[in-house]
Amino acid sequence: MTSLTILPITVDDLPFVRAMLYEAAFWRATGDAPPIAAALCAPELAIYVDQWGRSGDAGLLARVAGRPVGAVWVRRFPDHAHGYGYVDELTPELSIAVAPERRGYGIGGCLLSAMLALLRIDGARRVSLSVETDNPARSLYERFGFTPAAATEGAITMLLTLTPD
């Protein structure tokens, strides 16, 4: 049996994290997604990983047999330049993706569980995310206790209040 390892994201992992950002943004795989390089240059996506290592940035990478298969990361945004799942400057926004060929094996749940534990240890009071209403990952977030906080056309900002285990 191949083992799953989850380790902190390093600067060397950023190309893979960017690829996972692309997977998170264009999860439908309908063939009409823009090329990855062009998509990741768009300011609304670039803010999720550009200048990685700022205060409040934290991320985890999942590997199977030494190969990266998924990532989860959080970032706090200022009010004047924030992401899709923004709630406030104190609430980190979570991003997560698993490589398409590795979805459905529980890797996303392992990553999410590990990140929520890390956030609790770090004293975060809550965490947010944005998910499209028809994204199957929404059920994962609901299982972990995320609830709708706001809605826009086709997407929901979800929020989880973190309490000590």
PLM feature spans:
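Active-site rim helix/loop that mediates acceptor-substrate recognition in acyltransferases
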Residues: 21, 26-27, 35-64
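Conserved GNAT acetyl-CoA-binding A-motif
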Residues: 119-132
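Conserved acetyl-CoA-binding loop of GNAT-fold acetyltransferases
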Residues: 142-152
